[in-house]
Amino acid sequence: MEEQVANAIEIAGNPTSDQTLKAQAFDYLNQLRTDPSGWQVCLTLFTKTPQYSEIIRHVALEVVNSAAQAGLIDPQALGYVRDGLMAYLRQVYGQDNVTPDSTSIQNKIAQTITFLFSALYGNGWETFFDDLLSLTYKSSASTSHDNPLGIVFYLRVINAIHEEIGDVLVSRSRTEQDKANLLKDLIRSRDMQKIASSWQQILSEWRDGNDTIVEMSLRAVGSWVSWIDIGLVVNQTTLDLLFQQLGRAQKAELREGEEKVRDAAVDVFTEIIGKKMKPEDKMDMIIFLNLDTIVTQLSNSPPLHENRFTFKYDTDLAETVAKLVNITVIDIVRALEQDTVTADCKAKATGLLQAFLPHILRYFSDEYDEVCSTVIPCVSDLLSYLRKIAKVNPALAEQHSSILLPILKAIIAKMRYDETSSWGDEDDQTDEAEFQELRKRLGVLQQIVASVNEQLCMEAVSEVVGNTFESLRQSGAQLDWRDLDLALHEMFLFGEVAVRAGSLYSKGVPNNAAAERLVEMMLKMVESDIRSFTHPATQLQYMEICVRYSSFFQYHTHLIPTVLESFLQLVHHPIKKVKTRSWYLFQRLVKQLRTHVGNVAQTVVEALGDLLVINAELPTEGSDGDEMSSEDHEGSADAVFNSQLYLFEAVGIICSTPTVPADKQVLYAQSVLNPVFMDMEKNLAPAKANDERALLQIHHDIMALGTLARGFSDWMPGTSSPASLPAPEVSEAFMQVSEATLVALESLKTSFNVRTAARFAFSRLIGVLGSRILPQLPRWIDGLLTQTSSRDEMALFLRLLDQVIFGFKSEIYSILDALLTPFLQRVFSGIADAPTGTDDEVQLAELKREYLNFLLAVLNNELGAVIISERNQPMFETVIGTIEHFAKDIEDFTTAKMAFSVLSKMGSSWGGPDITPEGANGAAPQQQALPGFGQFMITRLSPLCWALPATPSFNSKDAQAKQVLAEAGGLQRTIYAKTGMEYLQYLRDRELPGMGMGADLVEEFVGALGRLDMKGFRQFFPSFIQRLSA
């Protein structure tokens, strides 16, 4: 059988094996894994001499591992595995072996041994550590750990055991954690002294002999220190050994692998400081270890000091030391923050903070971002502590300026692009993203500094910005773009201090001293020659700042032409990233300065003309064959078009300002519209023939038309009807847009993209056309709700219709009356189609809710009569039927709740005046009663309230179920308000007894309905049902 298993492993692992044979081999090995006796043959395969190939031995041991972890090996048999593996280890690792196992095999054995430790150390293998330690000696006569192969394996297992039971980053179940804690307790009580002694001895005996052994020993000490007695590590013997290894940092040249030993020694100190202790003990520990001196010596070592600004600079060591500084300072600040620590402890912490401040600044200002990032947590903690005490005693803020100022200067300096950065390079996108993330984190720190001492921050930023603009004035384009970018970035951040309620000004004057400074900075920036901003990064910053502080221009209107001229240059930028971003920023700027830009409308329209040409490009395929979506890349054709739309909106905004006469508005609008109309006309025939590019071109054209309309009107559907529609001649121009869109839609309504664009245009045209659009509503519905429209499309259009109803309720009745039945028939067909997957189910639920929302919009806007008009009455039964169905849907409580809301509203609308006090409607206007509706509510709607709780799977304690029941209770209270005693009598005589309810419960329910108001009964009904269900 051994040969059979070995053969199967060889076949499975050979890339050239026949695929059928390979599949059979995999099946065989999978069966072997679950075979209770499979592990035995695999253990033999692994330990046999002469040895099988590495892949056979690796897979064989893997089978043993999985069998042990799956519980296929009983405790007694685990002892057999232990004996087999230990015999192998003594034979192969217990002596000088010319061909040791590979690292992957060693790791696999260590994994198995670690599992056996977990299973047997508590009971069955109490000599575990003695047995492993015996491997570190060449013979029983050895007086020192003289077997390097055995030592490496012993340390490999030691480190694996920490990962198994001590590593806090490993996620464990409660049971696993309890077991880990038990094993740690056993080690501490049985073997810890012995293990710690072995580390000391190995470090001492091999300190200069084998870097791998020394590094693994240090890793073991560093990892285990977190859960063992600190005295086993912090003692003179061990510390002397650690200091010896730290001494390697003083070497100018290290042999290969030696730097790992040095870094591991620093990490031991980091782990010691990271160990949980009382603040008093931790401060004493920092002082005892003399960490200030250690860090100073490391910082002054050749790799970090002499090599600092050279290519030899050791960033790994810098990051390692930075970790030590970070964890130490975090603990110092923690001691300072705690109110419960002694005065002596606080004094020690204060002294340590002063000692470590140079170390913080040294690594925080390191030119390598990964080193700087390492100490950001401790800088953040320190600044947060200073902010906390400054709030308690503002006078202390000034005292701490000696700490704050150098940190602030370091923050600002680190925000500068370094000399090696090349902005916009495709190959450097990761570096750019990481730098921007670092800037973001540094920006947070700067805001904390500002909150501690605003004046200090103001002076520092003013100095950087002022000096930079002075240099710009003198040297112009020769100024390093990185310096200008830094100044602009600081201006952008400064708004966090200067801007209040979205503006630099309050009642016409700057908000505060910071706002005054920022106004000065803005004057210097805008008055600088834009041609000096030669780098794309600074050009983008310039635009971002103008938009962020647009309120500045409302009080310096003489500068608006200068800024607009700059923007009009930048919207034609040769770099796509700058150009497309500038389109968005231009739209933002003119929107915020709308009242001041009408006088340049013609100039702007003419200047933008070449950028308003629409050129649809089909998505290109990525390297994996998938189409790139617009979100995939900012430079994709889709993303560029989405940015281009901002220009159409900007034109609409500028052309529609009150200072532009109506005839000019029409002229400018038509200069943009006519080319688009011509393009649509040209592409309509090929689009009908399913030419994909022509269809996309029509989509883009319609989106552009809708976006131009959005620029002309501020009104958003669903808020209220436009307070003042554009001039009639402007609206007339946009009627052409509506007509052109409808013509395209009617011809291409099977295209999802065209429908999507048309729906967008429709929502935007409402704002410029107002009620003029209503007569076209049947055509819009016919084009937007087709046989191929998805439920999602229907739901979105229903939402739009809600807004139309709200905006034009006084004018829409006759149109709504004419289109309601065919419209609802399409919605019903969407609801009736069976969903085919999760996405479908989500869309169906959304469509149901939007349908109910639509009915509520009709009823709430006093248009309920349209549902029961002569034309739509044949549809009434279907409407009620769908609502009844939703009200009984136990799978969708949200929809059920809405269904009861709609029924209650129908009752309020058509049930006539309230005949009981405290009716459902309160002071709402009463609508004319629908004859027979009172009886309809009693016999048809009332039983619905009991249908859902009668479902066997209904849980009356569920929070959402209670909400549905409260709504059902509201419907019952509405029926009672409209029908009074007739309803109570019906409940008492027929409905409740018919459900099998006893006389006492009937009287309780009827009494509550007659006695309680709406709020009271909505609370009563869920609790009544809960008692019935108990």
Swiss-Prot record:
tRNA nucleus export receptor which facilitates tRNA translocation across the nuclear pore complex. Involved in pre-tRNA splicing, probably by affecting the interaction of pre-tRNA with splicing endonuclease. It is found in: Nucleus; Cytoplasm. PANTHER family: EXPORTIN-T, EXPORTIN-T/LOS1. This is Exportin-T. Belongs to the exportin family. GO terms for molecular function: small GTPase binding; tRNA binding. Keywords: Cytoplasm, Nucleus, RNA-binding, Transport, tRNA processing, tRNA-binding. One of its GO terms (biological process) is tRNA re-export from nucleus. GO terms for cellular component: cytoplasm; nuclear matrix; nuclear pore. Pfam families: Exportin-T, Xpo1.
